[in-house]
Amino acid sequence: MASDPIFTLAPPLHCHYGALPPNASGWEQPPNSSGVSVAGAALAASAASRVVTSTDPSCSGFAPPDFNHCLKDWDYNGLPVLTTNAIGQWDLVCDLGWQVILEQILFILGFASGYLFLGYPADRFGRRGIVLLTLGLVGPCGVGGAAAGSSTGIMTLRFLLGFLLAGVDLGVYLMRLELCDPTQRLRVALAGELVGVGGHFLFLGLALVSKDWRFLQRMITAPCILFLFYGWPGLFLESARWLIVKRQIEEAQSVLRILAERNRPHGQMLGEEAQEALQELENTCPLPTTSTFSFASLLNYRNIWKNLLILGFTNFIAHAIRHCYQPVGGGGSPSDFYLCSLLASGTAALACVFLGVTVDRFGRRGILLLSMTLTGIASLVLLGLWDYLNDAAITTFSVLGLFSSQASAILSTLLAAEVIPTTVRGRGLGLIMALGALGGLSCPAQRLHMGHGAFLQHVVLAACALLCILSIMLLPETKRKLLPEVLRDGELCRRPSLLRQPPPNRCDHVPLLATPNPAL
């Protein structure tokens, strides 16, 4: 999603007057206005006598009253990173500014739809197939979007691009998580997030170099076609955990054998213990022969639905409230754009470092509770004390809110992937990620209303953040625990009871250190 703010950034603009028409301005009078008052004509003349700029797509405060259209071309005073974008290509300003907001909404809806609808194929046909299919289609879709000749074509192809990129993100996340043992899951998940943050910085650098939005679109999407070489046998392996759950034992043995041979020291043969473990794999996995479930049967697992509801709501709020923490004084200048871009990426990287240091020590649930608490505190301070704080204090709490909301979003996604069983992990995690993408709609929705109601929206989101704090305490702890494989395992992942000791087979009752057996 890092490309959308650059592709839809409204540049500073003014009307190119040229030879002024008889009404002494570069603005066209609406056909319904047969006569303009003397005051209106004087205001139009004064507007023509100076260079007026605006970054508001509705041209509010820019156009003279009762004048809607510029007779000449628009002059765009340049973007921070590109010479022009789709807004300047088709003059999507003033009365056409709604198309820019519609493109932003469709792009986010593309991500939400991809997360939601590609989770089932990932569970049914495998993670590898979904990743290869969507990666292969990203390139043609992106190149086609760069060659589009109208804003309608751009919006359609951007929706499809978001749909496909969501499939790539979901499939790769599942494969990373299912490949690791319990002690490495957090590190691998955070490494993937840091790679994404690095991609944001790389995209900003490519935008500075390319200058043309069409060339930039081709540059970032066309190389995805090369990822089709991942389909070469033995190069990009299917998730062995998913193969075992689907009872494809021979394929799982083949994948595990390849991984074991790659990880063994150079020049050594595969050990006998590894060979015996691979041969006995079928006997040690007493799973049902089928892993297809009806929707009615899924409704019986109330604990799984409770975890999905809490984590989905938390992820939604963490993404929705993020735009409320923009630094004070963002006026649309190049320096403000760079500040917002670097601040968003920098706080995401800082959140990854914070989670890597604290989560394995204090647990997923505790750090998620702390992150949402900091998010709520930052919102309450900004809402209640905005008029009494200086710019430095406002910026400090805005950065705190950005940091904590980033950490909450990352950790809620990881925790959801760890409590959802393998049989439905694609669908469950896709639902969580789709809710997070829908939370991103709060920013274009606010722009659609010209910023009206921003305070009320922040109040509602802050109240929901406080509600998340209460609900997070109902979640189980998944630190150093095995991933649940079937629905029965996911149903046993519960929060430890506060009043009585849970039985030993509960998912939450796993000792941190193994106790010696006195009988031995």
Swiss-Prot record:
GO biological process: siderophore transport
Entry-listed glycosylation sites: N23, N32
CDD domains recorded: MFS_SLC22A17
InterPro entries (UniProt xref): MFS_dom, MFS_sugar_transport-like, MFS_trans_sf, Sugar_transporter_CS
UniProt topology in membrane: Multi-pass membrane protein
Subcellular location: Cell membrane; Vacuole membrane
Expression sites (tissue/organ): Expressed in brain.
GO MF annotations in UniProt: transmembrane signaling receptor activity; transmembrane transporter activity
Gene3D superfamilies reported for this sequence: MFS general substrate transporter like domains
Keyword Iron: yes
Record bears the keyword Hydrolase: no
Domain of life: Eukaryota
One cellular component term from this protein's GO annotations in UniProt: plasma membrane
Keywords on record: Cell membrane, Glycoprotein, Ion transport, Iron, Iron transport, Membrane, Receptor, Transmembrane, Transmembrane helix, Transport, Vacuole
Regions that span the bilayer: 100-120, 129-149, 154-174, 189-209, 219-239, 303-322, 337-357, 366-386, 397-417, 428-448, 455-475
Family per similarity comment: Belongs to the major facilitator (TC 2.A.1) superfamily. Organic cation transporter (TC 2.A.1.19) family.
Function: Cell surface receptor for LCN2 (24p3) that plays a key role in iron homeostasis and transport. Able to bind iron-bound LCN2 (holo-24p3), followed by internalization of holo-24p3 and release of iron, thereby increasing intracellular iron concentration and leading to inhibition of apoptosis. Also binds iron-free LCN2 (apo-24p3), followed by internalization of apo-24p3 and its association with an intracellular siderophore, leading to iron chelation and iron transfer to the extracellular medium, thereby reducing intracellular iron concentration and resulting in apoptosis.
Protein name as catalogued: Solute carrier family 22 member 17
Organism: Rattus norvegicus (Rat)
Taxonomy of the source species: Eukaryota, Metazoa, Chordata, Craniata, Vertebrata
